[in-house]
Amino acid sequence: MQIALLSEDPNRQSELEAIATRWGLEHDEDNVFALVLTDKQLELRKRDEPKLGAIFVDLVSGAVAHRRKFGGGKGQSIAKAVGLNKGATPIVLDGTAGLGRDAFVLASLGCKVQMVERHPVVAALLDDGLARAKQDAEIGVWVAERMSLLHASSHDALEQLMAQDDFVQPDVVYLDPMYPHPVNKKKSALVKKEMRVFQSLVGADNDADALLAPALSMATKRVVVKRPDYAEWLDNQKPSMAIETKKNRFDVYVNAAMA
């Protein structure tokens, strides 16, 4: 994939080249999107809209840290959806990892989470944020133990993983496909910015419906699909149950009891 690759720290140019090689990125000077390596982090910028600022993965501070400390623990909806309130600590595969926020919440509650991200730029951002989180004195140890990243299309990845001899099937497959955002729906400034940049970079998740069948084959216990409250069921399949929040709902497809 082509994108502008820029290093603001001359000492990190070789790191940027390694990132490009790892994720299959080619430098395009005129690209509207730039992947920028600063002295602190890897970030994505939309060069024709500088007011949008930079997008990067921060699992250590800010909103993510606040949610980890004050978000309601195992009583929050996502925890109930994956079955944490049943006394189990499931192994989770997050098939649409994005910036890793939901995966991080589940890992902070004790789950081992394998993240799959199909877009190379998003995967590169997530990998950088994960590496920085692993260095943090407060959370680094358990982040390293519980969170891992695989870059591949979720559809292909699920089948590829199932074919591996040493692969341990997850208890839960978690999906949060990108969904078109109605103009009249209110979102926070941060989420609006990210959605705007991501949807122009990644495009719509038009093949999201195709995720459900392989997810149901892979999960030993359940599949959880996060949807906006106004969205239809994924692949038009009715879930076993739904857990509703103010703006979203978690559609739960049960294969077996959590016990």
UniProtKB/Swiss-Prot annotation:
Specifically methylates the guanosine in position 1516 of 16S rRNA. Its main location: cytoplasm. One of its GO terms (cellular component) is cytoplasm. Its EC number is 2.1.1.242. Keywords: Cytoplasm, Methyltransferase, rRNA processing, S-adenosyl-L-methionine, Transferase. SUPFAM superfamilies: S-adenosyl-L-methionine-dependent methyltransferases. InterPro entries: 16SrRNA_methylTrfase_J, SAM-dependent_MTases_sf. One of its GO terms (molecular function) is rRNA (guanine-N2-)-methyltransferase activity. It catalyses: guanosine(1516) in 16S rRNA + S-adenosyl-L-methionine = N(2)-methylguanosine(1516) in 16S rRNA + S-adenosyl-L-homocysteine + H(+). This is Ribosomal RNA small subunit methyltransferase J. It comes from Aliivibrio fischeri (strain ATCC 700601 / ES114). Coiled coil: none annotated.
